[in-house]
Structures are given as structure tokens and as C-alpha cells.
Amino acid sequence: MKIVFIGGRDIHILGGIESYMLNLATQLVKMEHEPIVFCESDHNGEEFVNGFRVIHQKGFNSNLICKPWLGLKATLKTIRHIHDADIIHYNAWPPSLWSPIARLCGIKSLMQGHGLEWQRSKYSPTQQRIMKFMEWLTAHLNRNLIMCSEDQCRYFKKHYNREATAIPTAIYL
């Protein structure tokens, strides 16, 4: 199965999503799948890491626009150049805004939620309202939802009447 991951930062600068994609893609290669990872980076280019293809896309200094823009670029590149992709795995809502385009081209997709971003105190009230709207939009645009916690699944069921599957990606200490 050819699985395209869209939505992380540079895979060499390990954060939560990046570590998750690196480890999952590495295991998928061992199971004879073909993962392809698009990541935000400080340069454009391609490389192979642990047997899977990594496509670096240069981002720019606007968090509000950068991730949706890179999600669109990665979705279009998948449609145009990765003709036999079986599924696109979007990490978080910004890149998943383009999942309807993938579906129109016959590619299945899923969106993995990594938290309720608008609740984080680091964002201004205006940013929180925009994120809340984007969450609503994501809930309605994406057909297949997975979340990192049961709490997020319950939230999406309660507020959007959307079923989501919980797949915890962290470790338990």
C-alpha cells in the first residue's frame, strides 16, 4: 500500500508529529508498504530515510497560511506525480483542508487530530476564533477522522456529530 503523509515539519527536527511519522513510516517499510512523507522544511528537495521517500517543501513565516499552503502543494503533487497513492494521511486540520480535492481524484484520505489547537493559551483570541472555525470546517470536509485521544473523539461526536477513531500515539509512563 502506498501511503502519503502530509502535515509535519522537517523530519530531522523531531517533534511529536515528526517523531510519529518517522517511526510509523519506518515500520510500514518493514511491512512492505511504501510510505511517502511530505514535510515543511527550510529547503525544497527529496531524500530517502529508513527506506522511505521524504519530500521537503520550503515553508514561509506565516503559521496561519504556511501549513494550508504546503498541504495544497503536497496534495497536488500527490495527484500529479504519485499516481498510485492508496491513501493520504493528513496530520492536523491545516493541510487536510484539501482532502476533498484528493477524494475527487479517487484518493482516499484521513485526517488525524493532534489536539484542540484553539484551546491553547499561546494563541490570541482572534487566532483562537479562526482555529475554531477551521476545526469546524475540518470536521465537515474530512470523511475519515482519527484522533490521539478518546477525549477528542467524544468532543467531535458531541460538537459535530462525527465519529472518530482513537489511536493514541504517545507512550504511557
Put a short name on every predicted segment.
Residues 1-4:
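Extreme N-terminal starter segment of soluble prokaryotic enzymes
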Residues 6-14, 20-21, 27-65, 152-157:
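N-terminal strand-loop element at the rim of the active site
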Residues 62, 97, 110-127, 141-144, ...:
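A short, histidine- and acid-enriched strand-loop-helix "catalytic/donor-clamping" loop
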Residues 69-75, 80, 87-118:
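An aromatic- and histidine-rich active-site surface loop
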Residues 88-89, 140-149, 165:
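A short beta-strand/loop micro-motif in the catalytic core of glycosyltransferases
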Residues 151, 170:
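Carbohydrate-associated surface elements
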